Amino acid sequence: STALHLVDHQANQAMELALGQAPDPLPLDRIETIHVHNALHADWSQIFPASPQVMIVGNPPFIGHKTKTRDQVEDLKAVWGKDYDGYLDYVTAWYKKAADYFHYTRGGRFAFVSTNSISQGLPVAALFKPILAAGWRIRFAHQTFAWTSEAPGLAHVHCVIVGFDKREKTPATLYSYDTPNLEISRGCGLDRRNEWRKV
């Protein structure tokens, strides 16, 4: 709770500095729906039932396949089961959990900020093949961009954002950058063969 109040205060100060005024503080004392669990062991549907109105977005931990702890490897094995190949980054477990969470729900959507290693080399097939085979499609993706943090001692990383849905009638979008920053340079669509094409 203290961390939430601190972040709210910092965000309000930044907004006041940028815009000249800040909103009222969030009613954080009245939040009764915050659950403290290992997200990879929790049954998400018991915490919040899946429905077409639910959208999962997040920024899971950035831990590559070479830097995982023994406990994190066990987390990945528990989530991925027989599909865990040893090369998957820790963040991929959130993609799998979200896809499973919405398994029986039409209209669910999820997206995560991830290190760009999920879209390179060995992890690509291990992550995307089972999710696409389950009927999900990439609704949007941001190609590599630089992620910086104001926290002391944190390394700068290169990230992607990938969002999934099952709504085939909605055009898919790729946000592409000439340099790894957040300036959107062009939009692209994804056809059924998973080939990117310009819109």
Placement of each model-derived feature along the sequence:
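Short alpha-helix adjacent to the SAM-binding motif of class I
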Residues: S1-A3
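Conserved residues in the N-terminal Rossmann fold of short-chain dehydrogenase/reductase
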Residues: H35-V36
